[in-house]
C-alpha cells in the first residue's frame, strides 16, 4: 500500500468515529493507524492533534473533521 493510500485509509476509519460523535477515538484511530505504516509513523500531526484536543481546540465534529482531513 502506498503512503497516499494508507493516509486515505486512516482518514476513512477516523472519520467513521467522527460521524458517530466519538471524537476521542477518531483521534486515537488516526494516530494508531498512521503509526502502522513506515512512511507515516511518528507523523507530526499525531502530537499536534493531541495538543489541540487537550487545549479544547478539537471539541466539535467540524473541528475534528477539518483536522483529520488536513493530514497528508
Predicted regions and their residues:
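Short, charge-rich amphipathic alpha-helical segments embedded
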Residues: 28-53
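N-terminal acidic leader/helix
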Residues: 1-31
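Short, flexible helical or helix-coil boundary motifs
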Residues: 17, 21, 34-41, 57, ...
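Alpha-helical linker/edge segments of TPR/alpha-solenoid repeat scaffolds
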Residues: 52-72
